[in-house]
Amino acid sequence: MSTPAPVGFTGIFGGGPFYKTGNFDIPKNIAEIEHSGFSEAIVWSVEVNSQGDLNFNGEFPLTSNGVYVGNKTYPKFAADMATLKKAGTVKRVTFSIGSSNYGDWENITSLVNAQGVGPKSILYKDFKALKKAIPALDALDFDDENSYNLPTTVKFGVMVGKLGYHVVPDPYVDASYWQSVVSEINKKLPGTVDGVHLQAYAGGQGNNPCSGWNFGKVPVFPGVWDKNYTPSQVQAVMRGWHKECGIIGGFMWIYDDFVGNGLAKKYATAINKGVK
């Protein structure tokens, strides 16, 4: 049986514009991304507290005691995630866990060490509840920027893989650590990690997906920041990487900078043309 060819995703990270009804016209934003040319919508960022409860950005509680509570704050969020994939270009909805903030992945490590990853553990309950409440959710982006605990990250990755999620690491440094994460998770549950979001901006400025970031058959999707590049420049950068090592996807950081001004479609087109 032949291994299926890797799928390339053109992704866009965004925070409040995907859910914050008091600040944004959410139906308009959802429609903009749905028909933008992006194939992956990455909602950022899931915080994990010491009890294991999940929330977006300290302002949108998602789970409490292993139960989905998102409807109390934004009752249309689950339906909006489904709409993203309904009739346009978006094929994958991903939630990103962690950030440069200290704590989220440290809490995951502590919880895995204390409770394991079985059905009775809080993290298992959380991510099972999240998947059930938001069936459109396909993948989890692992944005660990300060914990780097291999055993617990692998256990957590395999756990969410068994719950039906794909895993997409989101590194900006320490390639060898992330190569171990990818190989160990896929060794235990083949196919779980099916892409890598490589940060080539901010702390990862200067990263090159063609140099030092080889994950074997798992494709690397480099990301750039709109503050650094116009759409035409993004296309040129992606085309250079595509010519150098055959990248098949990439992503933009961050939708919050260019909501509703037409740039979403221009950036998606730039990446899509660059990686062909």
What is each stretch, according to the model?
Residues 2-240, 244-245, 253-274:
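Chitinase-like catalytic core of GlcNAc-active glycosidases
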